[in-house]
């Protein structure tokens, strides 16, 4: 899980979602998981 100021899609499987006011990236590749912090 990467914590970044700006989250970006790394590949085409990455999806940007909002969960409880937190912007997250979920992907089939676990290395692409990100959270905005």
UniProtKB/Swiss-Prot annotation:
Keywords for the protein's UniProt record, in alphabetical order: Ribonucleoprotein, Ribosomal protein
Domain of life: Bacteria
GO MF annotation list: structural constituent of ribosome
Biological process (GO), any one: translation
InterPro entries linked to this entry: Ribosomal_bL36 (IPR000473), Ribosomal_bL36_sp (IPR035977)
RNA-binding listed as a keyword: no
Any Pfam family: Ribosomal_L36
Cellular component terms (Gene Ontology): cytoplasm; ribonucleoprotein complex; ribosome
Record-stated family: Belongs to the bacterial ribosomal protein bL36 family.
Name of this chain's protein: Large ribosomal subunit protein bL36
Source organism (scientific name): Azoarcus sp. (strain BH72)
């Amino acid at each position: 899980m990467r914590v970044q100021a700006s989250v970006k899609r790394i590949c085409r499987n990455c999806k940007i979602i909002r969960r409880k006011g937190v912007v997250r990236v979920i992907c089939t590749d676990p290395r692409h998981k990100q959270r905005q912090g």
